[in-house]
């Protein structure tokens, strides 16, 4: 590739990232560490990179220090790892600064990881995004050799979603603009929080989500993992969506898929579940009360975004509610999040925070109310839990029973105030 082309692209990209308008994500990065941004397609990995660039500029760095390169640019064809070195050389011919590297979709270049390792060995700061189809596998993390922090990039939180829609969440929001916030929640609940959806008319959102799923399915799953039985994978995804509130063992999922006339082995299902998680379509949580083998083989599976889950549901409300709670808890607690099933059925349990959470669309039916309260009182006794919470669609109260307080909170309020509701009681 010619030097003059590379130099012009470096300058063009600098002008672009300096001026682009952003919706600030609630993600804060250290200026002293190297990062790989991972997540679902269109979750905002590149925009998080732009956000970090603009943060560095506000901190006093010059735009000339920024070496941002978008390897998906149509003007870049058949780049080699030697071209990566040439990009560095061209930058050094333009500027006397020590660059901060932002390599967007760099996985397109074969052996890119060798270049990334070399940069970190030379003490450069490096930020990387990449396609799930070629990058989000365990071998890449191993290849990078612990030199990078893996930053998970999720779709918008509800607070970020409101910010994208120019709705301010002030300290007194519950009294000032609660009606506007509740009205906006419906879209977020059914269509999810992928950033680009904010630019799309409501009538077209489902089609956009369907297109995204198909690109992820064929590009990140079928092609990346050389899956020959794509119909079996589709059936598995649909069955996971239908079972989103319940534990699903490997054997059960294998039997369910096979019952449709598509024969798959348990080992194949295990592989497929691993692939689905690697491409960020789903995530799983384990049963805290299970023995080690059962923790792995009988998990609960949730979708990374409500909009994608809703593609597969007919009566979606109860599943979407629990899925949205799962997403928010997963973002906050990561591997500390469990469910608890052992003579008690508790939807979510975070032992490090002494917290148990039930999810119920409504407590108006007496049987439902009794079931949810009883489960929390039992786990409070068995595991000495002192923070008890029921998340509903739109109901709120404080229940006091057997000397325990159980907060009942609507989902839209909990999403905006969960820090205080979860940990400061």
Stretches with model-predicted labels:
Residues 2-13, 133, 139-247:
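Interdomain motor-coupling "hinge/lid" segment immediately C-terminal to the ATP-binding subdomain
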Residues 13-32:
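Pre-Walker A adenine-sensing motif
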Residues 37:
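Hydrophobic anchor at the beta1->P-loop junction of P-loop NTPases
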Residues 45-46:
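Conserved lysine of the Walker
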Residues 67-97:
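Short glycine-rich substrate-engagement loop in P-loop NTPases that contacts/grips substrate
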